[in-house]
Regions:
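Conserved anion-binding
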Residues: 1-111
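C-terminal helical cap(s) of enzyme catalytic domains, especially alpha/beta-barrels
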Residues: 39-44, 125-151
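Conserved alpha/beta-domain cores
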Residues: 109-114, 149
Length: 151
């Protein structure tokens, strides 16, 4: 099933209003948000929330505790944003299984099997680019690997 996601970095209320008019299923939000703000955004704009937590060190993984009751999906991402920086994906094991986990941050085909066992969702956008442009060869290889893992 395909879901449409708007990726927003520290969006203003006006930006959220504009994006809420699009046929998006989720707002993927980067920034410092607490439960109160997430509840407000969900109620006002009728969107599910993927909240991104930037990972610089192992203790950053635990920041999910602040938003686990309101964010629909917790995304653990590198602190590099669009730079596709890796982090120790095993750190996510400290998060409970009852939350929907998403991982991003320099995920390439060689890491897919390991990551698929740690997270429910994998964000691979930067890993499938060459010079900041989607690379059809990388996408094809990635999809072949996904099919192999699912067979």
């Amino acid at each position: 099933e395909t879901k449409f996601v708007g990726v927003l970095v520290n969006p203003s209320d006006e930006e959220l209003k504009v994006y809420s008019r699009l046929n998006l299923d989720y707002f993927q939000i980067y920034g410092n948000y607490d439960n109160k703000k997430i509840i407000e955004i969900k109620a006002k704009y009728k969107k599910k929330i993927i909240l991104s937590l930037q990972i610089k060190n192992k203790k950053d993984i635990l920041n999910y505790k602040n938003v686990k009751d309101t964010a629909d999906i917790i995304l653990w991402d590198s602190s590099g944003l669009e730079q596709s920086v890796s982090w120790e994906y095993d750190w996510i094991k400290s998060a409970p299984d009852n939350i929907t986990k998403m991982i991003a941050g320099n995920i390439d085909i060689d890491k897919l099997e390991i990551i698929s066992k740690l997270a429910d969702i994998v964000d691979v956008s930067g890993a499938l680019e060459t010079d900041k442009v989607k690379d059809l060869y990388k996408i094809k290889k990635f999809l072949e690997k996904v099919k192999e893992l699912n067979d």
